[in-house]
């Protein structure tokens, strides 16, 4: 996945182990510029203060959930273009529907494989390139 090597990713999860796993998987598929945030509030602060190209966010987090982060991103003129891939341990249909309705670029359920993450990231990036 060479197209994303220059992109800057933000991984948002309240569990540091999960952040490290996702970061490692992203690096394995060629995404070498990856930062981490422990919740939605920290992520939003980082997004407003820096240049990011892609967000991978857990849903269930303290302080600011992944859904609240997604809504804040989509409500911000400077950030709304960012693709957000939602990641969760729960595969509830209502969460999948809410993610899509709220503007998420995709949704995956933990645990997932490197191949699943690569497929989702690649599809999202191809979709963005086609609309650019």
Describe the function of each predicted region:
Residues 16-35:
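Two-component/phosphorelay signaling modules centered on CheY-like receiver
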Residues 36-54:
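Acidic, metal-coordinating helix/loop segments flanking the phosphotransfer/catalytic sites
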Residues 56-58:
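Active-site T/S-Asp motif of two-component receiver
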Residues 61:
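Receiver (REC) domain active-site loop signature in two-component systems and cognate sites
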Residues 112-121:
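C-terminal output helix
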């Amino acid at each position: 996945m060479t197209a994303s090597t220059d992109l800057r990713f933000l991984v948002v999860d309240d569990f540091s182990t999960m952040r490290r796993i996702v970061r490692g998987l992203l690096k394995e598929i060629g995404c070498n510029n990856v930062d981490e945030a422990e919740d939605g509030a920290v992520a939003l602060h980082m997004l407003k203060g820096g240049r990011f190209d892609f967000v991978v966010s857990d849903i269930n987090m303290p302080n600011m959930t992944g859904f609240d982060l997604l809504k804040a991103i989509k409500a911000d003129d400077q950030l709304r273009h960012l693709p957000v891939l939602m990641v969760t341990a729960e595969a509830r249909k209502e969460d999948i529907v809410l993610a899509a309705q709220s503007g998420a670029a995709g949704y995956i359920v933990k645990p997932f494989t490197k191949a699943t993450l690569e497929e989702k990231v690649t599809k999202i990036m191809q979709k963005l390139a086609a609309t650019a």
